[in-house]
């Protein structure tokens, strides 16, 4: 008996080590995705003055990744936090059916594409209002003298202060045009921010941002010009042949320069499949296999009613098991993970309970 256990015990550490290596390889092989609103964290002061990486109700992130929370953001709106994984299932099912009733405008116990479109536009407007309120508070943080304008130099001082630099010393150096002695990475971030600052500065440019211009700086989805700038940035990062358009192969590839993730590109079939479906069904409006800047801009514009209708149809199609082009209570509950991020069990029984 002892002679049999010895070799097995000796194998255990080896097996554990091998398992760890496999898990590590799998994790590093998958494309980076910083698209979840629930995963964002960081320095609070820095977050207040930096443009957010994630924009609620916008289909693509700033880095070109799909916003994996998008469907929940436009279906739940402010109620997103109520559907965390640890929420009580029965309570969550009831809330989901309350939302269903609100979307179902004609009370026929089914949701049409038009009803879903109106709901998406309503939830997007809520996100817009939240962004305006946040931007107003953040503007006050970078406009200490309260003159209603923020200069690029004022903003730069505040930004470097969040990076650990002494605010008074930085202000003095900028005033006297002395070397700031900042690292290369921070300098690159500053240059990108300055480009964005210029874009948000409405003609005639004076490098002074008003409160509304500062909103566009933080949230490009609020300004046609800044939305176009965001589209150009994304195409620049994904466009491999320099034609200022995107082919399917370019869109499903990782952005140029993310070398650490490219080895895992073929591994993550789900990531590629999702982007392929998005490209073919929603972004490439004329289905010619090429996405232009205009097409990408229409797709990314949160207040584009045509895009909202297409999105509504796609959301219905995903859960429409009886293929009648409507969403019914049973279908919404069964596909609750798609709509809320949480899987709610016993969906069939729940329909009768909640109605």
Swiss-Prot record:
Residues 302-355 are annotated as: Necessary for intracellular retention in Golgi apparatus lumen. The modification Phosphoserine is found at residue 92. It holds the Pfam family EF-hand_7. Ca(2+) 1 binds at residues 104, 106, 108, 110, 115. CDD domains: EFh_CREC_cab45 (cd16225). InterPro entries: CAB45_EFh (IPR027240), EF-hand-dom_pair (IPR011992), EF_Hand_1_Ca_BS (IPR018247), EF_hand_dom (IPR002048). Residues 91-126, 130-165, 226-261, 271-306, 307-342 form the EF-hand domain. Ca(2+) 3 binds at residues 239, 241, 243, 245, 250. Binds calcium via its EF-hands. May regulate calcium-dependent activities in the endoplasmic reticulum lumen or post-ER compartment. This is 45 kDa calcium-binding protein. It comes from Capra hircus (Goat). The lineage of its organism: Eukaryota, Metazoa, Chordata, Craniata, Vertebrata.
């Amino acid at each position: 008996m002892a002679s049999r256990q010895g070799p097995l015990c000796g194998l255990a550490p080896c097996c554990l080590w091998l398992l760890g290596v496999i898990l590590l390889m799998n994790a590093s092989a998958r494309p980076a995705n910083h698209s979840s609103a629930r995963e964002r964290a960081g320095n609070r002061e820095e977050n207040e003055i930096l443009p957010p990486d994630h924009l609620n109700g916008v289909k693509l992130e700033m880095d070109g990744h799909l916003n994996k929370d998008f469907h929940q953001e436009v279906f739940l709106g402010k109620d997103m936090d109520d559907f965390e994984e640890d929420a009580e299932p029965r309570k969550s099912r009831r809330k989901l059916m309350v939302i269903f009733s609100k979307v179902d405008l004609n009370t026929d116990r089914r949701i049409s594409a038009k009803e879903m479109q109106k709901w998406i536009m309503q939830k997007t407007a809520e996100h817009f209002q939240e962004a305006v309120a946040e931007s107003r508070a953040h503007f006050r943080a970078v406009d200490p003298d309260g003159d209603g304008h923020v200069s690029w130099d004022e903003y730069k001082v505040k930004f470097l202060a969040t990076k650990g630099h002494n605010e008074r010393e930085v202000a003095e150096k900028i005033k006297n045009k002395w070397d700031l002695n900042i690292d290369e990475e921070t300098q690159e971030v500053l240059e990108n921010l300055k480009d964005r600052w210029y874009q948000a500065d409405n003609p005639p440019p004076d490098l002074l941002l008003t409160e509304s211009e500062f909103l566009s700086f933080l949230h490009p989805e609020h300004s046609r010009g800044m939305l176009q700038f965001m589209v150009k940035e994304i195409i620049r990062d994904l466009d491999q042949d320099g034609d200022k358009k995107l082919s399917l192969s370019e869109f499903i590839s990782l952005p140029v320069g993310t070398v650490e993730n490219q080895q895992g590109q073929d591994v993550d079939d789900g990531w590629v499949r999702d982007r392929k479906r998005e490209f073919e069904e929603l972004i490439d409006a004329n289905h010619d296999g090429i996405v232009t800047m205009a097409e990408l801009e229409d797709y990314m514009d949160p207040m584009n009613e045509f895009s909202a209708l297409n999105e509504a149809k796609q959301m219905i199609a995903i859960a429409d098991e009886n293929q009648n082009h409507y969403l019914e209570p049973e279908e919404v509950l069964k596909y609750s993970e798609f709509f809320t991020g949480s899987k709610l069990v016993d969906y069939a029984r729940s329909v009768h309970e909640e109605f």
